[in-house]
Amino acid sequence: MRFTTTIWRPPSLENFKPKFRIYANGVAQVRIYCFGTVSSSRLYNAHNLFDKSPGRDRESYISLLFGFSRDGRTQEAKRLFLNIHRLGMEMDCSIFSSVLKVSATLCDELFGRQLHCQCIKFGFLDDVSVGTSLVDTYMKGSNFKDGRKVFDEMKERNVVTWTTLISGYARNSMNDEVLTLFMRMQNEGTQPNSFTFAAALGVLAEEGVGGRGLQVHTVVVKNGLDKTIPVSNSLINLYLKCGNVRKARILFDKTEVKSVVTWNSMISGYAANGLDLEALGMFYSMRLNYVRLSESSFASVIKLCANLKELRFTEQLHCSVVKYGFLFDQNIRTALMVAYSKCTAMLDALRLFKEIGCVGNVVSWTAMISGFLQNDGKEEAVDLFSEMKRKGVRPNEFTYSVILTALPVISPSEVHAQVVKTNYERSSTVGTALLDAYVKLGKVEEAAKVFSGIDDKDIVAWSAMLAGYAQTGETEAAIKMFGELTKGGIKPNEFTFSSILNVCAATNASMGQGKQFHGFAIKSRLDSSLCVSSALLTMYAKKGNIESAEEVFKRQREKDLVSWNSMISGYAQHGQAMKALDVFKEMKKRKVKMDGVTFIGVFAACTHAGLVEEGEKYFDIMVRDCKIAPTKEHNSCMVDLYSRAGQLEKAMKVIENMPNPAGSTIWRTILAACRVHKKTELGRLAAEKIIAMKPEDSAAYVLLSNMYAESGDWQERAKVRKLMNERNVKKEPGYSWIEVKNKTYSFLAGDRSHPLKDQIYMKLEDLSTRLKDLGYEPDTSYVLQDIDDEHKEAVLAQHSERLAIAFGLIATPKGSPLLIIKNLRVCGDCHLVIKLIAKIEEREIVVRDSNRFHHFSSDGVCSCGDFW
């Protein structure tokens, strides 16, 4: 039979040239040579030919190996290489270069090391292609040490070698190494290619270094590489991440060939810069231009829907995802669940979670737990967390950090025990969440222990711990920690400054230190940040410097609700009721959405100024116009408003109409008003209510005792004092503080412990003489002890605020203002005396008592208008 030299040729195998060699035994052996890029269909046909060939030579094996490698069929390429090795065929550099690329794609470190050994054995490491592929293998396996070692030992390197190493570092955010190598390769005479520039630009984008990015952009244009897709995409990404959206859009419009990555960069960049509508517009343009959407396209736009809470659009995208076959992509699946959760469609999120079989996926479980927490489903979140563990899904660090926000349904100590077993407590993410949970429960010591155990403390962990100290008023610990932070080379962010400024707003904190931190914030260019400026506003208002608070408020480029509320409350506490109401009117004019806190500040302003009708009007606005249901705090404010004005019947009517029984705070307000307005019977009722709820509350006993003393009922007063002794209730002593040269000094009534006590009492005697020259007569009714008037006058003269003022007058330059803080209410006699002292000494004196600020001007007038 005659042997034919023609065989059937598949129509799709255009780039393959089958050649035949006729052996003596008449068997044809096929060689398949691949030219150009082999498509998947052609490679499939080539593979079939290879399998059907009765005999195969080395060239056939190598050709198919190259085809598999180029087509990304890594497992088949690996098996074929092992066959070549097993058959003892001759190896060369091209084979190892090809199979090392396969190893890099597989991230198979063991296989890569075996290939490395073979390269050493055959002496192929001097080949630049093999060395480059080996570097790529190690870098993709995150083995940077060995990857760099291979690179450093290479005798010859080309631009691909440099780019491979640089790209490996860039993928793992090792930015310093990227930029160092980028400069070094040019110094050594290797010109970067488009992929090298893309990697360097990516790093500059991550660091937000727009200036250096512009320099690289100039070099790219000079080299004519700005039109290439990798560089073009990286430039667009750079400008977007640096906030230069306009420049990014210009580059995008000039890009002739736009890949799906180009479109995705614009969508995610717009979203990151808060331009949600522009991002949606870009997505629609992408579809109009018939660009095939990728998984990243869908993930980006679904996240956008989550931010905008667009349920309908989310549902449409869900349908498109199913159509494109992307539903089982983890990023898309998680993005859909998050979007449904943020749109409050928890049933849809839960249905998706169950339908697509997320049972073993920790990311999906975490997304669902987070969704429940965002929708006030703390119990459901904790139940899901428990179910997750029962089904054998191990929580990761993000799961633990999310579930720790489910306080008080879950105990941080319970989660802490689980975290210790996994060693996650040492991670910054979980450690910070854990210490934050302890802080919210007031367990600052536990939080500090967790903080000390975190290995790499980032700025978030430091800020959280500072916030804890701010919450508990541990000023010294917070300031010490801030010093440690800066000494450690960590750069404070806006939240760090916000926390430390909140610490400085505490009663026992130094105003001077607060000003120093303000200066530090200015130096760091963070003083204009919204959270920092709001903290500054609050600090200055609480420390008695309402003018500085007002200045900060005016300079704010943007104001959030916290800023508006802080300014209203600040004015209210300083007795500037009309300014507080003007701020409220400005809010209304700008259509700022108000909350319950806004009206608490407004009611406080009306209360301190005795504006009863105004307070009633704003209460109606809150309920009728703003649709805010009155809370316990709002009712307490209205009771205070009526009580201070002597309208106790209206105050009692508010209490009667409250949905829940009044608490001790409201009854204490009634009791204080009864003392001022001589309503003994109602005062007795209020005291009984308080003592029944809080038997240890000394304020109730003291107010009732004082009320009896003022009415001359010493017998009833004695009974109250006896009851206090029987129950071991101690009266809170009156303290006053003053800050001089960044140091705080405290005084008790009749205090003689200060080193300058002699000078202080001499100053008080001098002031007493000058006060009497002005016609001052002590009001001994404020001394609630059964002693003679002479002794009562001596007691009045030694009240703690007077001692603090006397010390301030001798310890500070003449004419400088004084700020006194007192833990109790200033008595009427001291109020009059301080007005006269301010006039005599020609000084401004600010006193912060338990109710409000009193600004005593040098002309002897108080900001409260003698109504407090």
Swiss-Prot record:
Q: Which GO terms describe its molecular function?
A: RNA binding; zinc ion binding
Keywords, ordered alphabetically = Repeat
Q: Which domain of life is it from?
A: Eukaryota
Chain spans, region Type E(+) motif = 742-772
Q: Where is the signal peptide?
A: none
What Gene3D superfamilies does the entry give? Tetratricopeptide repeat domain
**Which InterPro entries does the UniProt entry name for this protein?**
DYW_dom, E_motif, Eplus_motif, Pentatricopeptide_rpt, PPR_At4g14850-like_plant, TPR-like_helical_dom_sf
Residues of the region (Type DYW motif) are 773-868
Q: Name one GO biological process term.
A: RNA modification
Please indicate if the UniProt record lists Zinc as a keyword: no
Q: What are the boundaries of the region Type E motif?
A: 666-741
Q: Where are the PPR repeats?
A: 57-91, 92-126, 127-157, 158-192, 193-227, 228-258, 259-293, 294-328, 329-359, 361-395, 396-426, 427-457, 458-492, 493-528, 529-559, 560-594, 595-625, 631-661
- Write out the similarity annotation: Belongs to the PPR family. PCMP-H subfamily.
Extract the PANTHER family matched here.
Answer: PENTATRICOPEPTIDE REPEAT-CONTAINING PROTEIN, WHIM2 DOMAIN-CONTAINING PROTEIN
The protein here is known as Pentatricopeptide repeat-containing protein At2g27610
Q: Which source organism does the UniProt entry give? A: Arabidopsis thaliana (Mouse-ear cress)
